[in-house]
Structure formats: C-alpha cells, structure tokens
Design a protein with these regions (language model features):
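Extracytoplasmic/periplasmic ligand-capture domains
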Residues: 59-62, 75, 83, 87-118, ...
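Surface-exposed binding/hinge segments that line
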Residues: 75, 119-165
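Gram-negative bacterial Sec-dependent N-terminal signal peptides
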Residues: 1-21
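Mature extracytoplasmic/periplasmic domains
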Residues: 316-335, 496-500
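Cleaved targeting-peptide boundary
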Residues: 21-29
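Glycine-rich and polybasic anion-binding loops at the starts of cofactor/ligand-binding domains
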Residues: 490
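N-terminal lobe/hinge region of extracytoplasmic solute-binding protein
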Residues: 28-78, 108, 115, 177-180
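Long beta-strand-rich cores associated with HINT superfamily self-processing modules
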Residues: 349, 497-522
C-alpha cells in the first residue's frame, strides 16, 4: 500500500461517517456481475444478485442445509422420478402466478442461453425429462438414480415463462424482463457499478428486512474498506486481509468471519501439444508438455509452502487446502490432510522425469477476480523457481483470462471454486470430470484433466442414495485425484464481512453476499 493510500485509510478510520437510514442497506461487494440474467453464467457475483430476485425450487443455506423454496415439498416416487409440489401463493411482480410451467421452462432455458461462458447445464446433467403434471406439481425424471438432484437444482433460478420465452439477456439487464418473485424487486442496473432494488411486498416468504438495497460493485479491496469507513456503504464483503486487524480495533466497525468453502486451485494443462508458455531455460519450446508427467506435477505440489502463504500472504484470512473440500465437510478425506513441503524431493522428481535443469513456465491469473490470487501466484512462482522451474506470473483481465482458460491456452491457470453445494461432487462434476459439454461435465475443467477412475467415481456417487456409501466414494475420488495431482489446491478462503456495528451479518450459502443475511441488531 502506498503512503498516500495509508494516510487515506488512517483518515477514514478517524472520520467514520454516519450510516444510511435504518430501512435502507448499502452493500459494497467484490465479485463482478456478468449480467442480471439469472441463467447466463454460473458465477459467484451473478448468483448473489439472482438470489434477491429469483428463488430456486429448493433453497440451500449454509445454516440448516436444504429448505423449501418455490417447492414446499419433494419426494422420490421411483428411483428415477422426483415430484415437487409448488407453492400456490407465489406470484410474479406483474401479478401472474408462479407455476410449474415456469420451472420447466427455466430448466430448458438455463441450458441454452446465448453468450453463456459458464453454463448451468451441469446441474441438470442427470435430467431426462421435466413434466408439468398440473400448475402446482412438477415431475422430473432422471436418466439414472440421482440423490443430488434437489441440491443441484437449488443453483438454478426460476424465471417467468411468459416473459422469459421472448427475453434476451439484454432485456434482463435493461429491466424489461425483470419480472421477479424474490424478496426484493428490481429498480435499476448499471453494469460494472450497482444494482438498485426495493422490498417486494408480494413475496411469498419472510418479509425482507430492508425497504431499499443498493448493491454496489467495488473491485478494489482498499476501496471497499474506505467506502465502509467513510459511510458510503453499510457493509462490505471479502475484506482485505491487510485491513482486518485495523477494522477489528475500530469500535465503529464489526468484522464477521466464518469458515468458507471456496478454494483457490491451480489447474495444470493436460494439453498433449507443446505450449508456448513452457520452454527450456533458453526460451526454446519443449517437444512435449512436461505437466503430463505425474512426477513433474508432484514436484510442483510438494514445492509449495501453503502454511507460509496462509500466514504471510493471506495474513490468516484463509486455511490451507490439501484437497478441494475443507475439513469437516461431506467428502473430505482425512488421509490427505497434509501435503509435505519437500523441495529436495521435488528436485529429484524433476530429474527423474528428465528435467534436471528444470524449465520455464508462465502461470496466468485473473486480476481482481479472486482475492489475493495475483499475490498468491507470485508466492507460488517463488517456490517453483527454487526447485528449478523458473515461473513468471501474467495477470490479465478476467474477460480475457476466462476466454484463454476455456480454450486450454494456458500452461497453468488459477480458479476460485465455491463448492456451493457443500459436498464434494460439485467440484468433481465441474472442474475434475473429463470435459463433455453435451453432458454438462467438466465445464470449468480448464486444464482438461481426464481420469477414468475419477469419472467412474463421479458416476457411482451420483447414483448412490446412501449418504455414508456416497461419501466413501467421494473420499476414494480424493485419493485418485490427489495421488495423480490432477489439480493443485492452495487454500480455502474464510468468509469475511465487515459492517456498521448496529448490523448483524450471518453466512448465507457458500460465500454469497446478499441483503437477506444482514439484519439490524435488536
């Protein structure tokens, strides 16, 4: 931080301004929003916004697990058939009733939105047929038994058929198609800036706490902190790790920290072709991709001192990750609780693989997308350089980054994965399964990792209704992936918010930031 920004922050600490009126809430959030079309992209920021306007058929919360959403009840009527009872009092903001027709339409649309680069298709991969039995009854038939169907469709937000069937993403962004049925109603959207909303008095659920909500995008962590301290916003998310200690000492601020599910993960490229981002020490292209050799991947994995990164880079705002799920979650394998740091063995593995002198590698990372990702990448680069792999970090805008990552252009990419379903198969489906767009598998498998044993485990877990048996399958999958170093997990973010002291902030689901998690202290 520069001397000027430090002085500005100090001044803000002293001159913390007054808050907004009690009935209004102003949130400063970090995750960019690609659109307010709730079915365009499976992005964290888009999810957070959508939950204000478009409930799912089943609700998922960090506290309490699954809960009724638009469906009041659901059950298996056969191993491959689910029946959902839809609320009879849910209405859209234009006064028309919410029916099973809207839900059936939404599941079709969510798989085919033009311009999507992060499809929701994986959540519906097991679905063979969706039928409307009557206005309040939806029947979903799956291709095979799928115990995770309710939790998967909790991530797909329902839009109105009578508006959505002719609406484009631009129509949602402009407000033309924003006929909603959530706790808040749409007021306006300024791309790259903010979303304005108001309480929806026709909402079927619990009455919203706030009359009006201003949801403001502030990408820079220091700027978010300054906005809170100056009174421009009432709450911020993803608090800068460097600001936590200062804020905790400020009586005019309350810091809220909870364990998180989101992992920062490195994805090696499994492209068999040589990469321009991997060369010998003289800058000449190699004749093959060294990352295809598991000995090289193991060397990279064991060279990283994750504890040092957690302490020195993240300043305690993360917990070390040794697999994609954190400890004490469904599918975590305690046999892989630690990755020993061993640079000497790493060098020996490189020599054994035919790279005694190492090589050069460029790692790509998006700027201002995942908190501390560029700084973390630089730290990883130092650890790898020490074992002979001279690593350069290239930070690029996310819009550019995601295009290259999706095409597997990069030798090493970085992804922040939310594990939003709270169990291990979500990551298996999206970032580990062999890429198959038609089946909705591997949508975010940017490195194009492919392991038949992992794919087999995913299929078995997806068809197993017995929880202990399903968890055992996921734990076995952890062994498969981590022994093979299909990914290189670094850490799990803690979910950290800061607010005015008269507000209470509780976790919602995954690391989402929504107005519904904020209340006035009684």
């Amino acid at each position: 931080m520069t001397k000027l920004s430090t002085l500005a922050l100090s001044a803000a600490l002293i001159a913390f301004a007054g808050a907004a009126a009690a009935e209004d809430l102003r949130i400063g959030f970090a995750d960019p929003v690609s659109a307010i079309d709730p079915q365009l992209n499976n992005y964290a920021g888009d999810h957070s916004v959508s939950q204000h306007f478009f409930p799912a058929i089943v609700a998922q919360k960090t506290i309490g697990g699954m809960a009724p959403g638009l469906a009041t009840a659901w059950k298996n009527t056969s191993p491959t058939t689910w029946e959902f009872k839809i609320r009879d009092k849910a209405i859209w903001t234009d006064g028309k009733p919410v029916t099973a027709e809207d839900i059936a339409f939404s599941y079709e649309r969510a798989q085919n939105v033009p311009g999507s680069v992060a499809s929701f298709k994986s959540f519906l991969r097991s679905v063979a047929k969706v039928e409307v039995k009557d206005p309040q009854t939806l029947v979903i038939t799956t291709k095979e038994p799928d115990p995770l169907l309710p939790i998967n469709i909790s991530s797909i937000y329902i839009v109105s058929k009578h508006v959505g069937q002719t609406a484009t993403t631009d129509d949602y962004n402009s407000g033309k198609a924003m006929v909603t049925d959530g706790p808040y109603a749409f007021v306006s959207y300024t791309p790259g800036d903010r979303i304005e909303m108001k309480r929806n008095d026709t909402y079927w659920g619990e009455k919203a706490e706030w009359d009006k909500v201003s949801y403001r995008y502030i990408a820079n962590p220091a700027a978010r902190t300054a906005a809170l301290l100056s009174g421009d916003v009432d709450m911020i998310d993803k608090v800068s790790f460097s600001d936590i200690e200062k804020l905790e000492k400020n009586p005019k601020v309350k810091v809220w920290s909870y364990p998180g599910l989101r992992a920062l993960i490195l994805q090696p490229s499994f492209n068999p072709a040589p990469s321009k981002f991997i060369t010998d020490k003289a800058g000449r292209p190699l004749d093959k991709n060294p990352l295809l050799d598991v000995r090289v991947r193991r060397a990279l994995n064991m060279a990283i001192n994750r504890e040092a990164i957690a302490d020195r880079v993240a300043r305690g705002g993360v917990t070390v990750a040794t697999q994609w799920m954190p400890a004490d979650t469904f599918g975590y394998n305690p046999d892989y609780a630690k990755i020993a740091v061993d640079p000497t063995k790493a060098k020996a593995l490189l020599a054994e693989a035919g790279y005694p002198d190492g090589f050069k590698l460029t790692m790509h990372v998006p700027g201002e997308r995942y908190p501390l990702a560029p700084e973390t990448a630089q730290a990883v680069a130092q650890f790898w350089t020490r074992i002979g792999i001279e690593t350069q970090v290239e930070v690029v805008p996310f819009s550019v980054y995601v295009t290259g990552a999706n095409k597997n252009d990069y030798a090493m990419s970085v992804i922040g994965w939310g594990n939003g379903t709270g169990e291990g198969t979500y990551a298996m489906t999206s970032i580990l399964a062999t890429n198959d767009n038609a089946r909705g598998l591997g949508a975010s498998n940017w490195g194009r990792y492919s392991n038949p044993k992992l794919d087999e485990a995913l299929a078995k877990a997806g068809a197993e209704f017995d929880d202990p048996k399903r968890e055992a399958i996921i734990k076995d999958a952890v062994k498969v992936v981590m022994d093979d170093v299909g990914i290189i997990p670094l850490y799990h973010y803690k979910n950290i918010w800061a607010s005015r002291p008269d507000l209470k902030v509780v976790p919602w689901n995954s690391d989402r930031t929504v107005a519904m998690q904020v209340s006035k202290v009684k």
